[in-house]
Regions:
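A short, charged, and often flexible helix/loop element on the N-terminal side
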Residues: 69-97, 146-148
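Active-site proximal beta-strand in glycosyltransferases
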Residues: 18, 106, 121-141
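Hydrophobic/aromatic ligand-binding patch that stacks against planar heteroaromatic rings
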Residues: 42, 118, 122
Length: 148
């Protein structure tokens, strides 16, 4: 993994390649999407290269917050009771192919759905550092959306 630290006088630090995997993102309006929008904007501002992997959300092909991340759309299915959001399918082979071609320095998994699970499995298999955040208590929401 390349360091983002400067190697000498006058050198410009090299940004990291960061991959963000999520089930939801702008222009959807929810806490996870808004938080990730700020995270990605901050990473881009600091000259990191960002790849965003998310399910296609009907007509939404580009994130509403920014145009700089490389966006990879994957198939998804509607969340029962929450038809405006689609969860990503566990696209393990596609993730493996993407990361073999352009290996990220780190992967951030923002949601723990099937796509997020597949990302953790493939990152671990590929020896790529992976981190995750807890944004939503889906176990609690599952009762509300009648999927338990």
């Amino acid at each position: 993994m390349e360091s983002s630290a400067s190697t000498g006088a006058g050198d410009v630090p090299k940004g990291m390649q960061v991959c963000v995997v999520t089930e939801t993102f702008s222009p959807e309006v929810n806490g996870v999407a808004m938080t990730l929008g700020h995270l990605i904007m901050g990473l881009l501002k600091r000259k990191h290269l960002v790849t965003l992997i998310r399910p296609r959300q009907h007509a939404y092909d580009r994130p509403g917050c920014c145009t700089k991340p490389n966006v990879v759309l994957v198939p998804g299915l509607p969340v029962p009771g929450y038809k405006t959001i689609r969860f990503g399918l566990p696209m393990r082979r596609k993730l493996q192919k993407i990361w073999n071609i352009n290996r990220p320095d780190v992967i951030y998994v923002a949601t723990q759905g099937p796509l997020g699970w597949a990302a953790v499995v493939e990152a671990t298999r590929g020896n790529i550092p992976v981190i995750s955040g807890f944004h939503t208590n889906f176990h609690r929401y599952a009762q509300h959306y009648h999927v338990t």
